[in-house]
From Swiss-Prot:
It is found in: Plastid, Chloroplast. HAMAP family: Adenylosucc_synth (MF_00011). InterPro entries: Adenylosuccin_syn_GTP-bd, Adenylosuccin_syn_Lys_AS, Adenylosuccinate_synth_dom1, Adenylosuccinate_synth_dom2, Adenylosuccinate_synth_dom3, Adenylosuccinate_synthetase, P-loop_NTPase. It is an enzyme of class 6 (ligase). GO terms for biological process: 'de novo' AMP biosynthetic process; IMP metabolic process. This is Adenylosuccinate synthetase, chloroplastic. The keyword Transmembrane does not apply. The gene is PURA.
Length: 487
């Protein structure tokens, strides 16, 4: 049976307006939901206490330097876990990427915050947030984000440090990003148009400007002139004049004054904090399948969102890094172009997209949706050495008569592939072998104890653990902070 057997449920789900889970399929006879026996108050309190103890044990056991990394193509829900873990850490640090990352978190009152560059620990007053040298900084966007936070009562004063080694992302990088995509025509990458790739290109070709250059405005204009001329020589559609340069320099003089209190030698700050036994939580942007080296190249980002990016993006020694938590949706999504072996098309994909509200935080683009790809997940686990997984959006699968796991890839001739292929010609032709498991009908969004999950949901979680060889310690069953099960 496939997802198409429950397509008729979409209308009912839309009418219900829940936006959380699939409606239960009822092809022949109405399903009967047995009433749940209400537990005595004392037992309920005891269960809550056990859950709280398990949560405290899980979080307190994390190493001094821990990381939260994406293990698909992004949008897995990393920000929520970082937000939940942040109160137990002194510092939350971003190591790579820029405003192309979109992390959605909720405060204790349920107010939604969409962060792009500011680390997700910002909602916790005692947490210092660090944007490391591996990130790229669009200063106007950074200030817009801070202004938005402060207008909603979040104090950012003295709580964010930006590496003096981080590269500056200019509006010209964003313009070049759009021109580059237009030039590629039908083979475009599908970037966020935030200028990330062109900025990293400037970094690699060694004509980029860094945050520390804002302290030397006497030479800033000459360096920026090189960038403008480079873009103008490369793209006919890029207009450049000396007046544009003067305006941009004057603009950045104002930015430099405001940014100065945020600028720090974050390599020194972080390593000194490690010596002082402070706890550091690293928040990865994007995900391993978008890694410039290990992702589905060229449909990737321009940085390293895998474990290696922590060291190079923050200046932390490998021996200091302990627990790494891989965040993975209970199904798979992808924004933009590139191979997606388990993708669902037509009404099947639409149903999953609507139920999971799968639209990009940064771009608003509808995400491509499909079944959980175990081959890709296992590959990510191997690269990063995850100590545990956070399985998110399990509630979205509620109501399906069956759920599927893509457990292996076969070539067109039927030969099984032994690993995740780097060759896109091979990857685009693979035939996915699925393992079918029974679904569950009940709404699990209010469940807070693993033992209270339907048995079918528990089997799904445990089968994932068996297949990838990494334990699932955290299970997301809704968007709020409290919608998390500690296993």
């Amino acid at each position: 049976m496939s997802l198409s057997t429950v397509n008729h449920a979409a209308a009912a789900a839309a009418a219900a307006g829940s936006g959380k889970s699939f409606s239960a399929a009822a092809p022949a006879a109405p399903s009967v939901r047995l009433p749940r026996t209400r537990a005595p108050a004392a037992a309920a309190v005891s269960a809550a206490a056990v859950g709280a103890d398990r949560a405290a044990d899980r979080v307190s056991a994390l190493s001094q330097v821990s990381g939260v990394l994406g293990s698909q193509w992004g949008d897995e829900g990393k920000g929520k876990l970082v937000d939940v873990l942040a109160p137990r850490f002194d510092i939350v640090a971003r190591c790579q990427g820029g405003a192309n990352a979109g992390h959605t978190i909720y405060n204790s009152e349920g107010k939604k915050f969409a962060l792009h560059l500011v680390p997700s620990g910002i909602l916790h007053e005692g947490t210092l947030c660090v944007v490391g040298n591996g990130a790229v900084i669009h200063v106007p966007g950074f200030f817009n984000e801070i202004d938005g936070l402060e207008s909603n009562g979040v104090n950012c004063n003295g709580r964010i440090l930006v590496s003096d080694r981080a590269h500056l992302l200019f509006d010209l990088h964003q313009a070049v990003d759009g021109l580059r995509e237009a030039e590629l025509a039908n083979s475009f990458i599908g970037t966020t148009k935030r200028g990330i790739g062109p900025c990293y290109s400037s970094k690699v070709t060694r004509n980029g400007l860094r945050v520390c250059d804002l302290r030397h405005m006497d030479t800033f204009g000459d360096k920026l002139d090189v960038l403008f001329k480079d873009a103008a020589s490369r793209f006919e559609g890029f207009e450049y004049s000396k007046s544009m340069l003067r305006e941009e320099v004057e603009r950045y003089k104002r930015f430099a004054e405001r940014l100065e209190p945020f600028i720090a030698d974050t390599v020194h700050v972080l390593n000194e904090s490690i010596q002082q036994k402070k706890k550091i939580l690293v928040e990865g942007g994007q995900a391993t399948m978008l890694d410039i080296d290990f992702g589905t190249y060229p449909f990737v980002t321009s940085s390293s969102p895998s474990a290696g990016g922590i060291c190079t993006g923050l200046g932390i020694a490998p021996r200091c890094i302990g627990d790494l938590i891989g965040v993975v949706k209970a199904y798979t999504t992808r924004v933009g172009s590139g191979p997606f072996p388990t993708e669902l098309f037509g009404e099947e994909g639409d149903l999953l997209r609507k139920s999971g509200m799968e639209f990009g935080t940064t771009t608003g683009r509808p995400r491509r949706c499909g079944w959980l790809d175990i081959v890709a997940l296992k590959y990510c686990c191997e690269i990063n050495g995850f100590s545990s997984l956070n399985l998110t959006k399990l509630d979205v699968l509620s109501g399906l008569p069956e759920v599927k796991l893509g457990v292996s890839y076969n070539q067109p001739d039927g030969q099984k592939l032994q690993s995740f292929p780097g060759d896109l010609d091979i990857l685009e032709q693979v035939q996915v072998k699925y393992e079918v498991l029974p679904g569950w009908q009940s709404d699990i969004s209010s469940v807070r104890s693993y033992s209270e999950l339907p048995l079918a949901a528990q089997r799904y979680v445990e089968r994932i653990e068996d297949l990838v060889g990494v334990p699932v310690h955290y299970i997301g069953v809704g968007p709020g902070r409290d919608a998390l099960i500690y296993k």
